[in-house]
């Protein structure tokens, strides 16, 4: 059962990362790393997106804090939804 849910999560993350219409290398990595826990995959994905999208020079600025807060909330919601799928 764990192997099935792990594969389902990998497929979902693959689908999630390819919604821009092109097949990204990030999607290939997530599809092939089924040994990682769901939380680690979600955090890696969100951190990767944030690292590519952040152009802020000052880590203490208000805008940077708001963006970090938004990503953190998204991460918590995503992890919660994945955990619900295990029930």
Swiss-Prot record:
Instruction: Name the species this protein comes from.
Output: Bacillus phage phi105 (Bacteriophage phi-105)
Highest rank taxon of the organism = Viruses
Protein's name in the database: Uncharacterized immunity region protein 12
């Amino acid at each position: 059962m764990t192997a099935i849910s792990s594969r389902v999560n990998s497929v979902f993350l693959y689908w999630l990362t390819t919604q821009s219409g092109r097949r990204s290398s990030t999607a290939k990595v997530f599809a092939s790393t089924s040994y990682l826990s769901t939380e680690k995959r979600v955090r890696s994905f969100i951190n990767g997106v944030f690292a590519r999208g952040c152009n802020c020079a000052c880590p203490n600025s208000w805008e940077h804090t708001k963006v970090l807060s938004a990503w953190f909330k998204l991460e918590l919601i995503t992890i919660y939804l994945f955990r619900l799928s295990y029930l």
